[in-house]
From Swiss-Prot:
GO BP of this protein: nucleotide metabolic process
Record-level GO cellular component terms: cytoplasm
EC class (word): hydrolase
CDD domains cross-referenced by the UniProt entry: Maf
Keywords linked to the UniProt accession: Cytoplasm, Hydrolase, Nucleotide metabolism
Annotated organism of origin: Parasynechococcus marenigrum (strain WH8102)
Protein's UniProt name: Nucleoside triphosphate pyrophosphatase
Subcellular location: Cytoplasm
Entry's EC annotation: 3.6.1.9
Catalytic residues as annotated in Swiss-Prot or TrEMBL: 69 (proton acceptor)
Cofactor(s) listed in the protein's UniProt record: a divalent metal cation
Membership in a protein family: Belongs to the Maf family.
GO molecular function (one): nucleoside triphosphate diphosphatase activity
Length: 193
């Protein structure tokens, strides 16, 4: 069984759709306390901090703990969740018609003592949208809860022109990566047991 260290409904939904048995325990990590100038390392450090924070005292049936964190790298600037609607609208004015890299850090702590860390990157092409469309989207409140200020699994999907890379990564969890490391960790456990 997997323990997801996240309050993200989107990550939870991905695990449900993939039929990966899981439970959820929110980490409560203060993300602002972790700094790194390298965005790829930052998301991995945040993911590891989240997984580590919930790993103490886990039930015996939990074989691994997963932490994730995402951000958008756009024109060299790191975009996490917007602070308010004004910031979300300002970002969308910049992003409209452009492209950015959605980075998701993954940290899988396996009971055998292994840590699997990865940063998965997906190129996101944003549609050229109008000010009216930006305001309509920001008014929904959806962009305030998502790294980069958009939700591919929600209303934001219509504002995305295309993707290069892992679709589920943009939602917050690379299912191909997770399946691969879970499969590898099961093989390692059966080989050592």
């Amino acid at each position: 069984m997997l323990l997801l260290a996240s309050a993200s409904p989107a990550r939870l939904r991905l695990l449900e759709l993939a039929q990966i048995p899981h439970r959820v325990r929110v980490s409560g990590v203060d993300e602002s306390s972790i700094e790194n100038h390298d965005p790829a390392l930052l998301v991995q450090q945040l993911a590891l901090a989240k997984a580590t924070a919930v790993s103490d005292g886990i039930d015996a049936d939990i074989s691994s703990v997963l932490g994730c964190d995402s951000l958008l790298l756009f024109e060299g600037e790191v975009f996490g969740k917007p602070q308010d609607g004004e910031e979300a609208a300002a970002r969308w004015r910049r992003m409209a018609g452009g492209s950015g890299e959605l980075l998701t850090g993954h940290a899988l702590l396996v009971r055998s003592g292994e840590n699997r860390l990865a940063c998965i990157s997906t190129r996101v092409h944003f549609a050229a949208i109008t000010e009216e469309e930006i305001q309509a989207y920001v008014t929904t409140g959806e962009p305030l809860h998502c790294a980069g200020g958009f939700a591919l699994e929600g209303r934001g999907a219509s504002l995305i022109a295309g993707l290069e890379g892992c679709y589920s990564n943009v939602i917050g969890l690379s299912l191909p990566w997770l399946r691969s490391v879970l499969r590898d960790s099961k093989m390692d456990q059966s080989a050592s047991g």
